[in-house]
């Protein structure tokens, strides 16, 4: 059994999604939630909350591997910079615990789950619910984090079948 933590970084909310993968490659939902950062003071305090909160979740759930969404250029350069800082804090929380980090672009995640890189958030959320047998509407950030974890599980399974590492299995990765 392998436990994968998926992270959808954000400066206001960071999505957390945890799944277990059995020896047959089947995914099982363990936990998902948004890590709320608003109301935590100034931006540096939000980063501290992210670093600490994610560290606590890692200690509780003990993932074997971590997958995180790459930064994309959104509405503004300032937003992208804040997102980059949040992503950096999340990666620090992971690597400080000697866990491997795997990175996936939003298009790669959408392609892995829906079959097309231009899928919208509703389609991704729907597929996450189906794949993990979850009922009801999923909180968007947590659903995105579960999608990152599922993507890594698929890439990992392909890598194992091919006898290569995960970076080689997903050719568009850096």
Curated annotation (Swiss-Prot):
Its main location: cytoplasm. Binds 2 Mg(2+) ion per subunit. It comes from the Bacteria. The active site is at residues 8, 69, 141. InterPro entries: RNaseH-like_sf (IPR012337), RNaseH_sf (IPR036397), X-over_junc_endoDNase_Mg_BS (IPR020563), X-over_junc_endoDNase_RuvC (IPR002176). Mg(2+) 1 binds at residues 8, 141. GO terms for biological process: DNA recombination; DNA repair. The keyword Metal-binding applies. GO terms for molecular function: crossover junction DNA endonuclease activity; DNA binding; magnesium ion binding. It holds the Pfam family RuvC. Its EC number is 3.1.21.10. Belongs to the RuvC family. This is Crossover junction endodeoxyribonuclease RuvC. It comes from Xanthomonas axonopodis pv. citri (strain 306).
């Amino acid at each position: 059994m392998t436990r994968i933590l998926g992270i959808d970084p954000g400066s206001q909310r960071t999505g957390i999604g945890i799944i277990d993968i059995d020896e047959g490659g089947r995914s099982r939902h363990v936990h998902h939630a948004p890590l709320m950062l608003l109301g935590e003071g100034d931006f540096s305090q939000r980063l501290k909350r992210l670093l600490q909160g994610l560290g606590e979740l890692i200690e509780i759930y003990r993932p074997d591997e971590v997958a995180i969404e790459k930064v994309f250029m959104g509405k503004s350069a300032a937003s992208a910079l804040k997102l980059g800082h949040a992503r950096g804090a999340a990666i620090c929380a992971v690597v400080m615990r000697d866990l491997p980090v795997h990175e996936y672009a939003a298009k790669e995640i959408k392609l892995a789950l829906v079959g097309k890189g231009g899928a919208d958030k509703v389609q991704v959320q729907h597929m996450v619910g189906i794949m993990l047998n979850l009922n009801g509407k999923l909180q968007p950030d947590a659903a995105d984090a579960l999608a990152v974890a599922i993507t890594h599980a698929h890439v990992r399974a392909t890598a194992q079948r091919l006898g290569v590492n995960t970076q080689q299995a997903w050719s568009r990765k850096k």
